[in-house]
Amino acid sequence: HIMKMYSAYGFNEFVICCGYKQHVIKEWFADYYLQNSNITFDFTQENKMIVHNNVLEPWKVTLVDTGLNTMTGGRIKRVKEYLDGNTFMLTYGDGVADVNIKELLEYHRSHGKMATITAAQPGGRFGILDIENDGTITNFKEKKKEDGGWINAGFMVLEPSIMDLI
């Protein structure tokens, strides 16, 4: 979903920092084309496979083994050779948010900083139910914002000079 979101904004080159279960990620990408294509298997004479679809996604994806227990900075350092030396974006694999990538990049460029990190105020963990003795729910109170603090929302824009600090 993250790659489709970036692609919708015209960003189609990805470097994925692989660690835990990287073999599953690599297999998924290796099979992605076949899983999403119309295919004819011709076993009559030539035993060939014909894939009928054209390009599914306009993506170039590089998968890099960055280690099992490596922290974020170490992962960035390990993929440096696969980056083109320009401003790059970083998103955590569990990053699901309504972020306008073009606006994020424009904000980053307009402020001239080495790094821009999206921030969010997390909601409380649970909504509150008022329940009568017979089991009827009489009120539902939405989760409250915790303490008003901000957390890293997982979408970042970084300048190549960040490598000097890692």
Language-model regions: role of each:
Residues 29, 97-166:
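Conserved core of the sugar-phosphate nucleotidyltransferase
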